[in-house]
Amino acid sequence: MSIRLLSAIALIAAVTEPVAAEEECPSGFEERIALLERAPTCAKSRADFARCSYVASGDVGLSDVVIKKCEGDFLTKLSKSQRQAYDRRQEQCDRKYQNQSGTMYRAFAAFCRADVARDYSRRFTKGPKS
């Protein structure tokens, strides 16, 4: 196997999260969008995204839903410099795969962007430290 294929397999394994076998994803795109929108939290939306992804360009639309949900937790709380840092991290995801061809790489960038939003959501929604 080529190094490129092995790298792709490793990345797919890294972005997907283990889930219970009984959970099934909706078959249609619109139903998957609705599932992500109904998720009660950013983390749940991201987990459902991983479970129901296509690992193709269709993941861009799914990722947008996750990002919107996660951004609701923190976007208005960011200072100007924090917002610029967030935007830079999002842009880095796109640049990381910009020279790669194929829909799989659009999916990798979409996962990266969703992960950045999830990480910011976690940071800004933490409860008081005990």
Where are these regions (language model features)?
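Sec-dependent N-terminal signal peptides
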Residues: L5-V15
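Mitochondrial intermembrane space
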Residues: A21-S130
